[in-house]
Amino acid sequence: MFRTILLCSLGLTTLSSAATHNITSIFSSSLSPGAQIFLPSDTNYTEDVTQRWTTYDAPTYIGAIKPATVKDIQNIVTLAASNKIPFLATAGGHGATITYVNCTNGIEIDISNFNTVSIDASNNTMTVGGAVRFEDIIPPLYEAGKELPTGTAPCVGLVGATIGGGIGNLQGLHGLILDSLLSVELVTPSGDVLTVSTSENADLFWAIRGAGANFGIITSATYKIYNATNNGLAMSANYLFPASENRSVWEIFQSFDETLPPELSLTAYSGFNQTTQEMELIVNAIYYGPKEEGVSYLTNFAALNATETNLMMVAWPNVTSSMAFGADGDACTTGSYLNTWGLGLAETNIDTYTTFFNELQAFSQAHPDYSGIFVVDRYSSAAAAAVPANSTSYGYGYRNINSHLLFENSYPSDNSTLDNAVNSFMRSIRSQFQRTSGFSEMEIYLNYAHGDEGADVWYSPQHLPKLSQLKS
């Protein structure tokens, strides 16, 4: 779920003719032998080209190009601009913002060939290609006795998550993913290649850490990595609760508002069971430490009337698959119609959570074609908040978010009535949570943004003037 105001508008003032372009004739002579051009009419187009996680308000393409070299990307960017063809670069394909719908008749630059992983354990660094996903780095890092903060969906692109902040269950120990970023190689909108770090193009390095999708295509990135916590082992606990326990669960979540141990993360998943016609609530806890320590933080959950539980020690590569009783596959299914919304909270208001839980049940009962999941990510914000707010362009107050809310709304794509009902419901719910969020203004993890919040919310009023200056 990644925000961009970039590569669909790189000086492209006239887009109406893009659909008539023959992209093969325009680009083929400038590409290396390993590069490929794909058209939507190709038989295997959806297998050969990275597909989006969601089709909701998606961009439209007249074709895709899969570059093999950095020079290929430079040539694609230059030729696309000169021919007034909009484009987007994709890696994991998890961008879900509605702003992408404004990219029409463009080309997809599928950078999936940029998938290398190189670990320098002695110097605690890792260099990756721009298309590498979380699932590509976790096994080799684990084998090397190292770790890096990652998100919980294994198929999400590492770099894409990074430049929007990057949250996950190692955040309490090492901060946001972008706080571990050391440098990148970047193809600029003008087609130049730059090395960007604190010592080279430092202003640009500030900008890409929080607003990177606006400043170019990252072909490689180098990260600081860390010694594996608890020898790479974590406790994973899952609890399935009936609807009647939801208020008690939110009370426990509230008890962690002041202090959440850095080794502990909590995730709640709420959804409607079509069979029982009741809401259900799953809580997952990940603790990077000894089992007995982790269990000591979960006694209040264990005291509730869970209908199913499991608790196990898992190696880091198996953490995500252990969450929510192993139901992590949906996050990696492409081509679904998912209308996502999000919000960040500083505190937990039990009444707001309980009211929404009941309203989501009523909405689900009233709309049989609707299937919504409400996710609450709880990570310690201490390490992220310890980084000075002005050191990166990441939204000014985002580092103080205690709870990241994600609303995943799934329903048939041809139901405009339900589209309107869902959007109206989400606006109301977002406003309710915002009023009791503990923040004076809306705060949101950029990669969870819906796309209607506006630039002040995405980048913060404090950072937006400098970002605009660097963009001009």
Swiss-Prot record:
Pathway: Secondary metabolite biosynthesis. Keywords: FAD, Flavoprotein, Glycoprotein, Oxidoreductase, Signal. The keyword Lipid metabolism does not apply. The keyword Transport does not apply. GO terms for molecular function: FAD binding; oxidoreductase activity. Disulfide bonds: none annotated. Glycans are attached at residues 22, 44, 102, 123, 227, 246, 273, 305, 318, 390, 415. Induction: Expression is under the control of the azaphilone cluster-specific transcription factor azaR. Residues 54-228 form the FAD-binding PCMH-type domain. InterPro entries: FAD-bd_PCMH, FAD-bd_PCMH-like_sf, FAD-bd_PCMH_sub2, FAD-linked_Oxidoreductase, Oxid_FAD_bind_N. FAD-linked oxidoreductase; part of the gene cluster that mediates the biosynthesis of azaphilones, a class of fungal metabolites characterized by a highly oxygenated pyrano-quinone bicyclic core and exhibiting a broad range of bioactivities. In the first step, the non-reducing polyketide synthase azaA forms the hexaketide precursor from successive condensations of five malonyl-CoA units, presumably with a simple acetyl-CoA starter unit. Belongs to the oxygen-dependent FAD-linked oxidoreductase family. This is FAD-linked oxidoreductase azaL. It comes from Aspergillus niger (strain ATCC 1015 / CBS 113.46 / FGSC A1144 / LSHB Ac4 / NCTC 3858a / NRRL 328 / USDA 3528.7).
